[in-house]
Amino acid sequence: MLEIVLSNRFKKDLKLAKKRGLDLNLMDKVVSSLASCQELDEKSHDHPLSGNFEGFRECHILPDWLLIYRVDDEEVFLFLSRTGSHSDLF
């Protein structure tokens, strides 16, 4: 199981998600799957990012609720970078 590390920006994004009334249990399920190195469902559209987010991956919790994360090279940490809608993140 990977150790989960939250960025400061992710913590702010999480507060906004709570304020918007999003179901944080859905995020917990996705993060638990990632932390235990399980593959995500096809509907999550997990894929690598490029540009400013090169080295990171993105998955969909809901169609317009995304999670940007990175697994470190030694596969010890799961770094949660951002969460939010497409317009929030890009």
Where in this protein do the model-derived segments appear?
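Basic, Lys/Arg-enriched alpha-helical interface segments
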Residues: 1-63, 72-78, 83, 87-90
